[in-house]
């Protein structure tokens, strides 16, 4: 019996051992270790954003936990290790502390995000957000993620935002107590000491700020007292526009240039003490400015040498470059104002003239401009506007005016405007136009002149976005172009705006050669000009490729993206500069290479706005063969100077009116989207002022031309004549007929196919005809009126 019991107990022991071993084998399942390793690998990929999977994991955690996701990574790794080796879920005090710390960090991240941005996080689906984050390769600041967002959204209505801040502090303290083995009193003592130290530093900073504010106030008060003292020392300027009153039936309100003129002259009178060369103290200031300019020149020479070693990756920012000051422009001279009594008298004459012809109307307002005076007439009920317009010549006769322009009706008002030339045109300087608007945040802001009311008119080129300037010889077109270029030089640095100047007349724009804003030297050869426009088209297409790869829509968005990347990355990438292309005489280009120029202008005007490329085209021959329908339709902004006929005016601005302008800078401006014209007296700019601005710019930085943008040298046709005796006859025949083909030469000269083909090749090589384009006829590149013909 005893032996049997021993055997049974032995069997029980062996079976129990087998059971425990089998349990151990089951518990030691290798799948658990594989899962743990996989979790660790995924967490490492997410932390360092390695590859596609790493970015997706980090996007997911960023969306859920926001900035607190880094603590989540650590907690997941620790929990994985604990569960793997202890084979149970951790239920300790530190586990609770970690969870409380995670919740506290969610609150902290979301509160920081809320106070910084002042906006709420968007409630996007998780998968769509993760996909967008991966697709754009960026991880935006999302505060406390979706969990933090909903925690804050639920808590604020219950306990207010201030209560949430208190709860967050308590959660942080509780997590520290749970995670550490210190007693509560010790933790509270340390916390109180830290709070006291923080309040002490905060009070010190506030006291320092109050002291700085007090010093600034005292400095402002001192400057105001000095300005008052200077004004008291200054002699009073007598008003030369004191008018003797003429007895009238009633007083008509008069506005405009006389008031603006007095303002613009009272302001510079204070500056005269600073900038006049007559005062000895100002000579010292000028010497000091000259010394500073010499130092700037030395610094910029060094910077230019360093720029030349850099490849054509982009324009290097010259930190020491300073835009030219407005003091380089001449101060506007004081001029005799238009007599108000004379203006009142003409207003009464105008009313009487209209009454004599059966038109009952009253002059309600008079605006005195630099060149013309506008009489605003309000016709009585039932009077047709066309009746006033038909009295155009009678009104001019009654007022003894050269010509009058009638604006019927004035846009946005129930009145008719009659513009009568002044006896003497008041000169408008570019300095007084730019004084109120410069420096401008828009680097393409240019000054045009003053309108009828005497208000300065400045327009941004990037809103035009392209401009057509046309007018007869001597009307002020070239002065307007110089004013636009000078405005850009006064407002933009070389790395911000680039210029390409095309001047077939070879005399107007050569003064700008050597300025650092130029992409290439001023182009004077018409053949090179066509190639230069094609280079601009290629640059436009290159920029659109950059926009496509960077997922941006225009130059503004691309430059903002580059600025953000430059802040985050060590490698600095250059921003794209704006490019302004100015063609001073379009007619000369259309005679030499009409089709190429027209096609290039069409591409630029249709697509280049988003790429930051803007075109200004000027011509003194506003005919339909120069300003073609394609060019006109794609250039929305236009300036019309004085022209000889109403047909030319309609070619430029679509309506008549430019034939009645006075010349000497008198213009009609039609902006992009405007339904009416604005009459402007253009700003005058002397050659010496242009030269002073150019010298100031060139002394700081030399031109750094882009070789890729330079057009190829024109082919020397004297060296590329044909050996065939019939070449000259074929040349004249093709130019006269303005068409060319092998079969046409065969029939005309009764020659074989081979000889006719060789003649066609010679004509193409000498740039008489264009290349073959499939079944289309070849284009003849030489005009019949060409000097060579």
Swiss-Prot record:
The chain crosses the membrane at residues 34-54, 63-83, 99-119, 137-157, 158-178. Residues 1-25, 209-275 are annotated as: Disordered. Residues 454-650 form the FtsK domain. GO terms for cellular component: plasma membrane. The keyword Nucleotide-binding applies. Residues 179-789 are cytoplasmic. InterPro entries: AAA+_ATPase, FtsK/SpoIIIE/SftA, FtsK_alpha, FtsK_dom, Ftsk_gamma, P-loop_NTPase, WH-like_DNA-bd_sf, WH_DNA-bd_sf. Pfam families: FtsK_alpha (PF17854), FtsK_gamma (PF09397), FtsK_SpoIIIE (PF01580). ATP binds at residues 474-479. It is found in: Cell membrane. GO terms for biological process: cell division; chromosome segregation. Its main location: membrane. It is a multi-pass membrane protein. SMART domains: AAA (SM00382), Ftsk_gamma (SM00843). Residues 209-231, 247-262 have a biased composition (Basic and acidic residues). One of its GO terms (molecular function) is DNA binding. Keywords: ATP-binding, Cell cycle, Cell division, Cell membrane, Chromosome partition, DNA-binding, Membrane, Nucleotide-binding, Transmembrane, Transmembrane helix. Essential cell division protein that coordinates cell division and chromosome segregation. The N-terminus is involved in assembly of the cell-division machinery. The C-terminus functions as a DNA motor that moves dsDNA in an ATP-dependent manner towards the dif recombination site, which is located within the replication terminus region. Required for activation of the Xer recombinase, allowing activation of chromosome unlinking by recombination. Consists of an N-terminal domain, which is sufficient for the localization to the septal ring and is required for cell division, followed by a linker domain, and a C-terminal domain, which forms the translocation motor involved in chromosome segregation. The C-terminal domain can be further subdivided into alpha, beta and gamma subdomains. The alpha and beta subdomains form the DNA pump, and the gamma subdomain is a regulatory subdomain. Homohexamer. Forms a ring that surrounds DNA. PANTHER family: DNA TRANSLOCASE FTSK (PTHR22683:SF41), SPORULATION PROTEIN RELATED (PTHR22683). Belongs to the FtsK/SpoIIIE/SftA family. This is DNA translocase FtsK. It comes from Staphylococcus aureus (strain COL). The gene is ftsK.
